[in-house]
From Swiss-Prot:
One of its GO terms (molecular function) is RNA binding. PROSITE patterns: RRNA_A_DIMETH, SAM_RNA_A_N6_MT. The lineage of its organism: Bacteria, Bacillati, Bacillota, Bacilli, Lactobacillales. This is rRNA adenine N-6-methyltransferase. CDD domains: AdoMet_MTases (cd02440). It comes from Streptococcus pneumoniae.
């Protein structure tokens, strides 16, 4: 692999695996797709065959030039040479996002596509352990993401599917946007609440009596088995106790 390639990327080259991924994406001929990381253009080419338009964002200069040459005659593909973390997704246009993201930037990128885009569906190839962390409502990331999207695994991708072979397995996941569980006017309060909640700084949020009432109202018997819905209930109690509702 070229030494200048950014973010230590691992590439999917197997036609069989690429086709399996495409089948899971549920894209239509009318769909506009934003792809994170053009890479060598293998997935980009297949995306363009089943969608209306693909805008693919690639930071690495070597890969951008390589894919530009490969895809220059494909009228359905637009390539952009930019860092995805600096890219601005459109506000009004309907679109979906697809991407295989660098493992060590997973948190930054998933926050970017969930909180700074209006994509209805987001398909990401991520490290398997990271996927599990997105579901963990005892972590900040899980509690933030769940307010905007539902997350599900679509496909397991063993390390052998990639070149060079990584040390971990990956999965294809789908994030489906739903109506937000936390209105914009309460978002800053929610992020503050979450920061204290995951660190078990309950006294920063409630008096002893308030905490007992909030837990009772949410029907929480054991904090270790608490659900996302129960955390939301406790947050609503926090708002009420602070005169925000």
């Amino acid at each position: 692999m070229n030494k200048n390639i950014k973010y230590s990327q691992n590439f999917l080259t197997s036609e069989k695996v690429l086709n399996q991924i495409i089948k899971q994406l549920n894209l239509k001929e009318t769909d506009t797709v934003y792809e994170i990381g053009t890479g060598k253009g293998h997935l980009t080419t297949k995306l363009a065959k089943i969608s209306k338009q693909v805008t693919s964002i690639e930071l690495d200069s070597h890969l951008f030039n390589l894919s530009s040459e490969k895809l220059k005659l494909n009228i359905r593909v637009t390539l952009i040479h930019q860092d995805i973390l600096q890219f601005q997704f459109p506000n009004k246009q309907r679109y979906k996002i697809v991407g295989s993201i660098p493992y060590h930037l997973s948190t930054q990128i998933i926050k970017k596509v969930v909180f700074e885009s209006h994509a209805s569906d987001i398909y990401l190839i991520v490290e398997e352990g990271f996927y599990k962390r997105t579901l963990d409502i005892h972590r900040t990331l899980g509690l933030l993401l769940h307010t905007q999207v539902s997350i599900q695994q679509l496909l397991k991708l063993p390390a052998e599917c990639f070149h060079p072979k990584p040390k971990v397995n990956s999965v294809l996941i789908k994030l489906t946007r739903h109506t937000t569980d936390v209105p914009d006017k309460y978002w800053k309060l929610y992020t503050y609440f979450v920061s204290k909640w995951v660190n078990r700084e309950y006294r920063q949020l409630f008096t002893k009596n308030q905490f007992h009432q909030a837990m009772k109202h949410a029907k929480v018997n054991n904090l270790s088995t608490i659900t996302y819905e129960q955390v939301l209930s406790i947050f609503n109690s926090y708002l009420l106790f602070n005169g925000r509702k």
